[in-house]
Amino acid sequence: MCNKNEELKQYLVPGKHVHLVGIGGVSMRPLGLVLQGMGMIVTGSDMNASVSTDELIAKGIHVSIGHKAENVIGADCIIRTAAAHNDNPEIAAARSHGIPLFERAQAWGVIMQAYQNAVCISGTHGKTTATSMMTHILMEAGCDPTVMIGGYLPLLNAGHRVGEGDTIVLESCEYCDSFLNFAPTLAVILNIEADHLDYFKDLKDVEKSFRKFAELSSNGVIANGDDPHVVETLEGLEYTTFGLCIQNTVHPENISLDWRHFDVICDDEYYCHLDLKVIGKHNALNALAAVAAAWKLGVPGEAVTEGLKTFGGADRRMQYKGNFNGADVYDDYAHHPDELKATIEAVRTMKYDRIIIAFQPHTYSRTKALFDDFIRELSKADHLVLAEIYAARERNTVGISSLDLQAQIPGSVYCRTLPQVTAYLRTIAGPGDVILTVGAGDIFRAGEALLK
């Protein structure tokens, strides 16, 4: 077991030596930079050299490539990524030498206590987009925020930012109850669905985690009042609602058919007008969540309008990649049936002749647990190409393959490798089509290869 959060506070002070195992990771890299900015001596290690490790080295952080026991010598404490298990030589060395060991999420939880405003954006879907939208708003408002996003944001040329202001914004994930280590002053809940069922037992178990998260917030909760699972989860708690229905505290009026243009009403008063570049009802909801948080923080409506006007989407969220043989090619991170539903509905409004989806399921446990839901949503494609399941952190202990999906979806095609996906797409794409590479793994490579 890792030491408790309270114990970590004594180590996150100027002059202490903190070593980060897996420092090149998407949320470890900004963590290292924030700790350095707080006056700590930061070192780290990662399995491979990368753009991330190069950036850290350029900023004066010593990074060792490869995990070795000697890397932890002299450290006052160790912070590890979730991917660094107890058999990692540095973790084993820390344990044997009695060096205090902490999780990444615990460190973020301590850090955010130094900020007047700690906005933690959670939900089964939409976290990266909503956190990115919030970042655009706060940057436009001159708040100089510190930001941690689970994806790349062009505005930042990164997925993170270390600011000098009194506000920190974090994408907050429920997996392994990670967000229960946080200390939000404002908790945002976008939606709740059954997911990460390799950790949670069922939907009720997921809901329990989100309720605990909401109860952590010291200055309010903003939640989707249109989502029945959210409403059920928060029963008996006070919170501010956002959503499309007029009963919500924050809701739209005069909304366009493509969900991109509308006025926002907050507590029965006009707050701002939005002209979004991103499409779909799901993105209108993401925007309303960000607007509600900005309103609660006292951000002027004009800054919200201008901030979201420049938001063109986060990396791998309906990202336009190019055109092949007259067909537009997009990439999207959707890896849950509800996300697939939202993506397909949004693309239908774009009036293409055919929607061609190349889908790569993400993790065996999710594919098994949500099998029937995947069949229902994937069947809505005009043409479906299935890549093999992306294992991520798992081994195939449940005996499932994309071939099982293919057998249940008439007309679908199975490709064992990504080059086979690309080759097949070349044979079917034509003018008037849209090609979507979809999934949280590396399916985007199939689309990129198509455009070369």
PLM segments and residue spans:
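N-terminal leader/targeting and accessory segments in enzymes
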Residues: 1-103, 107, 251-253, 279, ...
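Nucleotide phosphate-binding/pyrophosphate-handling subdomain across enzymes
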Residues: 3, 8-19, 27, 31-38, ...
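Phosphate-binding loop of NTP-binding sites
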Residues: 9-11, 31-40, 57, 71, ...
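Short internal beta-strands
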Residues: 40-47, 220-225, 357-360, 382-391
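Beta-strand->loop->alpha-helix junctions that form or flank phosphate-binding loops
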Residues: 45-46, 64-67, 102-109, 148-149, ...
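C-terminal helical cap/extension that packs against the catalytic core
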Residues: 238, 375-431
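A glycine-rich beta-strand to alpha-helix segment
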Residues: 420-451
